[in-house]
Amino acid sequence: MARGFGRKKFCRFTVEGVKEIDYKDLDTLKSYITETGKIVPSRITGTSAKYQRQLSTAIKRARYLALLPYTDQHK
């Protein structure tokens, strides 16, 4: 089993000094959702726990308001 020696992940929101993640910022939210519509976990993205909670809440609010889809396009 090969072990990866990639770069250390960092929280983008901490580096940029973001106070709170907004559900209306769709460009940011789309980068944390997979093609199937799932929220990408923090162990993959490197997002800190504080911002991961805010991110998931913002994505769920955007889904509820139909700004983001719940699932992918079933074709």
Curated annotation (Swiss-Prot):
Signal peptide: none annotated. The keyword DNA damage does not apply. PROSITE patterns: RIBOSOMAL_S18 (PS00057). Transmembrane segments: none annotated. Keywords: Ribonucleoprotein, Ribosomal protein, RNA-binding, rRNA-binding. GO terms for biological process: translation. One of its GO terms (molecular function) is structural constituent of ribosome. The keyword Ribosomal protein applies. GO terms for cellular component: cytosolic small ribosomal subunit. Binds as a heterodimer with protein bS6 to the central domain of the 16S rRNA, where it helps stabilize the platform of the 30S subunit. Part of the 30S ribosomal subunit. Forms a tight heterodimer with protein bS6. Belongs to the bacterial ribosomal protein bS18 family. HAMAP family: Ribosomal_bS18 (MF_00270). This is Small ribosomal subunit protein bS18. The lineage of its organism: Bacteria, Pseudomonadati, Pseudomonadota, Gammaproteobacteria, Thiotrichales.
